[in-house]
Amino acid sequence: MAVWLSTQNKFYLPPQPVTKIPSTDEYVTRTNVFYYASSDRLLTVGHPYYEIRDKGTMLVPKVSPNQYRVFRIKLPDPNKFAFGDKQLYDPEKERLVWCLRGIEVNRGQPLGVSVTGNPIFNKFDDVENPTKYYNNHADQQDYRKSMAFDPKQVQLLMLGCVPATGEHWAQAKQCAEDPPQQTDCPPIELVNTVIEDGDMCEIGFGAMDHKTLQASLSEVPLELAQSISKYPDYLKMQKDQFGDSMFFYARREQMYARHFFSRAGGDKENVKSRAYIKRTQMQGEANANIATDNYCITPSGSLVSSDSQVFNRAYWLQKAQGMNNGVCWDNQIFVTVVDNTRGTILSLVTKSKEQIKKTHGKTVHFSSYLRHVEEYELQFVLQLCKVKLTPENLSYLHSMHPTIIDNWQLSVSAQPSGTLEDQYRYLQSIATKCPPPEPPKENTDPYKNYKFWEVDLSEKLSDQLDQYPLGRKFLNQSGLQRIGTKRPAPAPVSIVKSSKRKRRT
């Protein structure tokens, strides 16, 4: 018996096609011209925990070993170079750009473990090796203590032609129909921001807005209490469709939990009664309440060693992880680094006037200061490349970065106007009307509101790569160095003199 049944197969429509992003290797032609660039010795000095101000004026900046250093490298415009080879490129049909081939970030100063802490740190009880049951975490006393430790060990080197993107947890907007109370836990959300020079990195206390979400100012070290600690958003930068924010990166993070303790304060989300059996009140205890479950650790980065250094070594860029294979659009490079393995804090001590002529004295006769210093040097190997000014390339570049076309001084000529306009001859005389004010020049820099360490290499390029350390490494690695062959010496020719025979008579 035949029975008709409706089909059970499901039909799936093909997904909509996505816009294809071409790789820079498809429209950027590389030449055999290379340049070497190097910065000066870059130094910075400041207080390791906070900046010192006097009446709104900053006297000493904050220079912490746990801060990001973001260098904005400005390169010269290769289209303004005077090349001896006229066949290198056609300025009517092509434009020149820089491509990054090698980089080396050198760090000075000796290795040293940085120390961070807080003189009023929220440490209540030792829960690692407890000797007594403390359940008075919510009383009226102040249990804060002065505590210091070494942070998580972080080394990071990241570079691209746009700034790196960071992520952190911040307070979210609260719902208007159900407003929370002041003591309720605020909603939080993950936000993305640009990593700027001087931002704090994550050192074991989470990537979050500590200033907004921790009102006690005692949950983290001093350098984080009024700051935002950011973590690079590797997931988002790896999915960047143009691949400009991260050509490649090298990182090393290391941490272990050194000590375990609990925090004091009211426990609004205490342990539910069904999760434990009610305890018996012991002698000397004010109540039989359960202790707080607000646990915390003190991080430690452990040993610093020269065997595990990310810096002071050369990196060669053969193939970037994104679609941008090292092309430095707008003639700039952003280098983002973190290195707290050279986090030694210098202690400076001066004598008071009463102690200058004495050999012994009390501590009140001395004044102490804290400073942290950092030393950098950046080296680059750049390759000269060219882009054809085809309509397809210009359309794509304009949709990606409109400033590229503007910097190349490519514009469409305006159509002639059909109206008659007035043009006065003597604009500066009192006989004619005042000339209209010139509009202020608009700052077209898209990063004018961000803070970076500006490094200008416009006059620090050289094509003599064999005269510099990184250049010689590149020549040896790439096989571009001319190897001279010694011409073999001619074989010696032996001349045998024949002896003349005397003629017999």
Swiss-Prot record:
Instruction: Write out the ranges of the annotated region (Disordered).
Output: 479-505
Keywords (A to Z) from UniProt? Capsid protein, Disulfide bond, Host nucleus, Host-virus interaction, Late protein, T=7 icosahedral capsid protein, Viral attachment to host cell, Viral penetration into host cytoplasm, Virion, Virus endocytosis by host, Virus entry into host cell
Q: Which GO terms describe its molecular function?
A: structural molecule activity
One Pfam family per UniProt: Late_protein_L1
Please tell me where this protein is predominantly located.
Answer: virion
State the source organism's domain of life.
Viruses
* Compartment(s) of residence: Virion; Host nucleus
Q: Which GO terms describe its cellular component?
A: host cell nucleus; T=7 icosahedral viral capsid
Which GO biological-process labels does this protein carry? endocytosis involved in viral entry into host cell; virion attachment to host cell
**SUPFAM superfamilies attached here?**
Group I dsDNA viruses
State the protein's purpose: Forms an icosahedral capsid with a T=7 symmetry and a 50 nm diameter. The capsid is composed of 72 pentamers linked to each other by disulfide bonds and associated with L2 proteins. Binds to heparan sulfate proteoglycans on cell surface of basal layer keratinocytes to provide initial virion attachment. This binding mediates a conformational change in the virus capsid that facilitates efficient infection. The virion enters the host cell via endocytosis. During virus trafficking, L1 protein dissociates from the viral DNA and the genomic DNA is released to the host nucleus.
**HAMAP family in the cross-refs:** PPV_L1 (MF_04002)
The family line of this record is: Belongs to the papillomaviridae L1 protein family.
Q: Could you give the subunit structure recorded for this chain? A: Self-assembles into homopentamers. The capsid has an icosahedral symmetry and consists of 72 capsomers, with each capsomer being a pentamer of L1. Interacts with the minor capsid protein L2; this interaction is necessary for viral genome encapsidation. Interacts with protein E2; this interaction enhances E2-dependent replication and transcription activation.
The protein, known as:
Major capsid protein L1
From which source organism is this entry? Cottontail rabbit papillomavirus (strain Kansas)
Name the encoding gene, please.
L1
